[in-house]
Amino acid sequence: RGGGIYVENGGVFTLKSGKISGNQAFMEPKSGIFATDVDSYAKGGGVYVEAGGVFNMFGGEVSKNATRSFFKNWSTGNDRIYHAYSEGGGIYLEGSQEETVNGATVTVPGAVFNMTGGKIAENATYAQGGTSASSKSRVTHANGAGIYVGTGAVCNIKGADSDSASTNIEMMKSFPQIVNNSCGGQIVKASYTTNSAIEVKGGGIYNDGTVNVKNALIASNDFSEARQSDAKTAVHIMRDEYLPEGQRTITYSDGKTATLP
C-alpha cells in the first residue's frame, strides 16, 4: 500500500508542485498447495491515504504509478476462493473504519482528497489470476486507475472559475486534470475454474464514497483490457472500452499513447 506516499490517520499531505511518479504497489502471493481462501491486494500505487488522513493537491502531478496484484500457480486441492484486487493506481482513499479505543468502538471517517489543480495521469491498475484447479470462485478486480474512493471517503475536485474572456482551451489547461489512466485484468489457464470473473471499473475514478466535481477535465480514461482463457470466465467492464487480446496500446487523437503494464 502506498508505493510513493502513505498518509496515516490524522496526517495531512500537501502537494503544490513536482511529481509523484514511477511508483508501484505490488502483491503476489507465492505458490502453495495448502493455502486456502487467499486474497491478493495492491492499493495506492502513487499515494495511499488512510481513513482520517487528508491529501491536498494544489498543483504538480501524480503520474505513471501503478498497482499490480497477482495470484498464480496454486495446486489442486480443496475448494478455494481467490480474489486479486488492484485499486487506486494513482491515489487510493481508504473508506471509514471502526476502531476499538478503551473498549469502545470509534468510527474513523474516510480519507479526504481535495484537488484544485495539477494532473493525475497515465496511472494504471492491473490484476491477474493464474493457474488454479477446482476453485469455487475467482475474481480479478482492477478498479480506479486514477483515483479509488472507498466507502465513506470524500473526493473534492474543484478548479477555479475562469473569467468570461478565457477560451475553452485556456480554461481546460487551468482545470484539475484526470486523464489517460488505464485499468486491465486477466485470468489465464482457468479451464477447471467455475464462477470466474474479471471486473474492470472506473478508468479515471472509481467511486464508492462521495465525489464532488466542478471545473475539471476528466477524459481519455477509457483504455482497458480484459482477457480470458476459457468460456467459463465472465468479463465485466464498466465505463471503459474493451480491447481484444494482443491490442495492449491505444493511440489518442493528440498522438499520445497508453500501454498496459
Describe each model-derived feature in a short phrase.
Residues R1-P261:
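Surface-exposed loop/turn motifs in large extracellular/passenger domains
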